[in-house]
């Protein structure tokens, strides 16, 4: 298994994404748990949302340059849960500390709000399930 060339990732992304703000490595490579068949998970934040076709083409360029499958995520269009995973478990490869901190605070705030909303739904489901079980109804 080859060593990951972070400089190659940074250069290719900076050369191809206008107004790029942040680059993160996440998944198995950021945790040091990659294996022979692992893909490379990369997340980017730019001033504007990336076009899906352009993002796919860029992922293919990265895959060719790195000789590995690449999953390229645009954080502007990613789910709150995925953004939270990138911020809390990923490794920042490029960008300013200020941009990283602002994105992290925004993401964690949105994630906490989502968790609060989910909790109300979970509580309702649990209450309905318990009531059905108490009445002997099938779940």
From Swiss-Prot:
Q: Any idea of its EC number?
A: 2.7.7.108
Q: How is the cofactor bound?
A: Binds 2 Mg(2+) per subunit.
Q: Which Gene3D superfamilies did the record assign?
A: Beta Polymerase, domain 2
Swiss-Prot/TrEMBL catalytic activity: L-tyrosyl-[protein] + ATP = O-(5'-adenylyl)-L-tyrosyl-[protein] + diphosphate; O-(5'-adenylyl)-L-tyrosyl-[protein] + ATP = O-[5'-(adenylyl-(5'->3')-adenylyl)]-L-tyrosyl-[protein] + diphosphate; O-[5'-(adenylyl-(5'->3')-adenylyl)]-L-tyrosyl-[protein] + ATP = O-[5'-(adenylyl-(5'->3')-adenylyl-(5'->3')-adenylyl)]-L-tyrosyl-[protein] + diphosphate
Q: Which residues bind Mg(2+) 2?
A: 39, 41
How is loss of this gene reflected in the phenotype of the organism? When mntA-hepT is deleted, has a sight reduction in swimming motility. This gene cannot be deleted when the hepT gene is intact.
MF terms per GO, please?
Answer: ATP binding; DNA binding; metal ion binding; nucleotidyltransferase activity
Subunit arrangement? Forms a complex with cognate toxin HepT, may form a homodimer by itself. Forms a heterooctamer with cognate toxin HEPN with stoichiometry HepT(6):MntA(2). The 2 MNT subunits do not contact each other in the heterooctamer, each contacts 3 HEPN subunits, blocking access to the toxin active site.
Name of this chain's protein:
Protein adenylyltransferase MntA
